[in-house]
Amino acid sequence: RPGRRSKQVADWLQKQLAVSTKLEFNEIDLRAIDLPFLDESKIPALGQYEHSYTREWSSLISSYDGLIFVFPQYNWGYPAVLKNALDYLANEWKDKPVSLVTFGAHGELKHR
């Protein structure tokens, strides 16, 4: 989306966390990843990916110990591009700690 703000929020978050943690951060920009709408013929749980971009996406996510998703809320939900990226994989997400940082025009709620 033009004028997106996730990068600014992610940069701010990384600076805040750098004060109190030794975690290493890498940015994954789904615009740069540019996955097409899910087009694998087999379910992701099988891990039998036919497309090279799916195998690359799988390898990238598998290389991380945990994830922090930073994304805008659209109509109280998450963006379709994120849903699509999540749907491409299955086992790669299993047992991986995840945090969500969201923002939107309607205000935010603290979720626990």
Where in this protein do the model-derived segments appear?
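Short, glycine-/small-residue-rich phosphate/pyrophosphate-handling segment
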Residues: 97-112
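Hydrophobic/aromatic residues located in beta-strands of well-ordered beta-sheets
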Residues: 25, 95-98
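Short, conserved loop/helix-junction motifs that constitute active-site signature segments
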Residues: 89-95
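N-terminal beta1-alpha1-beta2 submodule of the flavodoxin-like/Rossmannoid cofactor-binding fold
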Residues: 1-71, 76-84, 88
